[in-house]
Amino acid sequence: MVVVLIIAILLGMALPTFLGARQKAQDRAAQSNLRNALAAIKTGYLDAQSYIGASSALSSIEPSLRYVTNAGGSSDGATTIAVNAVDDQNVGMAVLAADGVCWELFDSAASGTTYGRVSNRTTTNCTASLTALSATSW
């Protein structure tokens, strides 16, 4: 009986740690996919000199991700990237992590990349930002 009690106490201490690590891993996976998509669109930008032209070539540059490129497109998971090429020089991207956090980035050819995080999102409202975000990193 004492052994069962000790195991229960150890599980009670380990479970919150495990759940926190799982959430962090889900966030990092989504962020990594978003960075890969950014690298892909920058590669396309070098060829087309336009984010609008580059967004159409994303799936051939980085085929492991799925891209939603219409203006109202929303990410529905960590491997689906919502892309909004605002104009030739600016692009917004977003991805929904499994824990409901929408990770965003906005890249401007003139001023660089900014990042954002929005909690409590769903598959219908994790959309790419149309303007620069507030943070310079996650």
Regions found by a protein language model. Name each.
Residues M1-F18:
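N-terminal single-pass transmembrane signal-anchor helix
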Residues V4-L5, A30, G92:
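Intrinsically disordered, low-complexity segments enriched in polar/charged residues with Gly/Pro
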Residues I7-I9, R35, A128:
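Alpha-helical interaction segments
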Residues A39-W138:
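Periplasmic/extracellular, small/polar-rich flexible segments of pilin-like filament-forming proteins
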Residues A14, A21, I41:
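Conserved alpha-helical elements of the SDR catalytic core
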Residues T17-R35, Q49:
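Aliphatic-rich helix starts adjacent to a transmembrane/signal segment
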Residues V3, F18-L19, A54-S59:
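Generic detector of short, locally flexible boundary/turn motifs and exposed helical patches
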